[in-house]
Curated annotation (Swiss-Prot):
Record InterPro entries: Cyclophilin-like_dom_sf, Cyclophilin-type_PPIase, Cyclophilin-type_PPIase_CS, Cyclophilin-type_PPIase_dom
Coarse class of the protein's main subcellular location: endoplasmic reticulum
Motif Prevents secretion from ER, chain ranges: 189-192
Protein name: Peptidyl-prolyl cis-trans isomerase B
Regulation affecting activity: Inhibited by cyclosporin A (CsA).
Glycosylation site residues: N124
Species annotation: Aspergillus oryzae (strain ATCC 42149 / RIB 40)
Length: 192
């Protein structure tokens, strides 16, 4: 039997001293929206979590800072991470252009989950999405690797921005600053 766990089960056990916590400071149309803080499931999906963490810090010379949320679908998700083209056709990982699906142990069971966007099996790069509802039809197709810890109201604000055809925000929704946070309570939860 495959070890599939709900996000709720992971959340209650997931975090340990190895938790990476990253943030995005976001603007919409050059006006600050706020900060989203994301916890990464580093023990369950270490390669995927490390890719996202390194792209959030920009430590490899490229990453999320300055990139946009290019696709927003109400009652589904917000998508970003294409820092090379900005339209959903680009991006790259810290491991090269694409990397394999690490595993599908965590299911898309609630809003606020962080998952890899892809163009099919084993095509992970830098694009990601944050769910705004449970999305079980994505289980086994997209790797869940974290969740929103703080600032979900910013995700909701992005979800509700006016859009043009193609689900693109009418005004730019930009990650103006991103990085890694030192968390004082990293050790307060047990991870898998």
């Amino acid at each position: 039997m495959t070890d599939l766990r709900s996000a709720e089960e992971i959340t209650s056990q997931q975090y340990s001293s190895g938790l990476a916590t990253v943030y995005f400071d976001i603007e919409h149309g050059n006006k600050p929206l706020g900060r989203v803080v994301l916890g990464l499931y580093g023990k369950t999906v270490p390669k995927t979590a490390e890719n996202f963490r390194a792209l959030a810090t920009g430590e490899k010379g490229f990453g999320y800072e300055g990139s946009t949320f290019h696709r927003v679908i109400k009652e589904f998700m917000i998508q970003g991470g294409d820092f090379t083209r900005g339209d959903g056709t680009g991006g790259k990982s810290i491991y090269g252009e694409k990397f394999k699906d690490e595993n599908f142990k965590i299911r898309h069971t609630k809003k606020g989950l962080l998952s890899m966007a892809n163009a099919g099996k084993d095509t992970n790069g830098s694009q990601f999405f944050i769910t705004t509802v449970a999305t079980p039809w994505l289980d086994g197709r997209h790797v869940v690797f974290g969740e929103v810890l703080e600032g979900y109201e910013v995700v909701e604000a992005i979800e509700n921005v006016p859009k043009v055809p193609g689900d693109k925000p009418q005004q730019v929704v930009k990650i103006v600053k991103s990085g890694e946070l030192e968390s004082e309570d990293k050790g307060s939860h047990e991870e898998l």
